[in-house]
Amino acid sequence: MRPSGRKTDQMRKVSFERNFSKHAEGSCLVKFGDTHVLCTASLEEKTPPWLRNSGKGWVTAEYGMLPRATGERMKREAASGKQGGRTQEIQRLIGRSLRAVVDLKELGERQITIDCDVIQADGGTRTASITGAWIALYDCLKWMESRNMIKVERVLKDHIAAISCGIFASQPVIDLDYLEDSSAETDANFVMTGKGGIVEIQGTAEGTPFSEEEFTTLMHLAKNGIAELVELQKQAIA
């Protein structure tokens, strides 16, 4: 039995609140149960130095957690003067995931930065960030299209969503919350496109190694869950 009472293949309630920020070109408050992340997309008319005069743009991401996003207050990383390894890993994952469905040539020599700020954490912050970041990116591109800068359908090739799966109490489960994640035997994150293409899989056995059969089950759970998330994205932008 899962602590939340959910079935093994049941995700938490997911919601998207678009245009949460009045300043950003695109923004979305995404909620996966009690995990809440604010995703904002900011447009700059410049590219990183290595892309100058290439005709290509860039999509990148930054990730952070508010000090009291968790049970006990965390020290701000800015106060220590450097980002932690986990933060760097997650923000690179978000950027890679989004770029997988963006035609950088069609974007032109511009940069879109997605900021993912975790307001409240209860497991799955990176997967919620990726899923919400796609909405923020979409709205940023729609903002650009309204000013005749780009055509969204040429720049954005597909949806991107992500979900966690793992083995908890010897059962393969989807969308782990903190209680499950902190004691899971196996923890994995899946990032996939709307068409079912695999962008990234991160999987770790926390205790006992997992079998190929168990991995296949997790993959099946993730595929179904991501299809559900993509459908929710489509409903949100309709």
Curated annotation (Swiss-Prot):
Assembly and binders: Homohexameric ring arranged as a trimer of dimers.
EC number, UniProt record: 2.7.7.56
Organism for this UniProt entry: Rhizobium rhizogenes (strain K84 / ATCC BAA-868) (Agrobacterium radiobacter)
Database matches in PANTHER family: EXOSOME COMPLEX COMPONENT, EXOSOME COMPLEX COMPONENT RRP41
Amino-acid positions noted as binding phosphate in the UniProt annotation, renumbered to this chain: R86, G124, T125, R126
Record lineage: Bacteria, Pseudomonadati, Pseudomonadota, Alphaproteobacteria, Hyphomicrobiales
Database matches in InterPro entries: ExoRNase_PH_dom1 (IPR001247), ExoRNase_PH_dom2 (IPR015847), ExoRNase_PH_dom2_sf (IPR036345), PNPase/RNase_PH_dom_sf (IPR027408), Ribosomal_Su5_D2-typ_SF (IPR020568), RNase_PH (IPR050080), RNase_PH_bac-type (IPR002381), RNase_PH_CS (IPR018336)
Origin superkingdom: Bacteria
Endpoints of the signal sequence: none
NCBIfam families: RNasePH
UniProt keyword list: Nucleotidyltransferase, RNA-binding, rRNA processing, Transferase, tRNA processing, tRNA-binding
Protein name according to UniProt: Ribonuclease PH
Record has RNA-binding as a keyword: yes
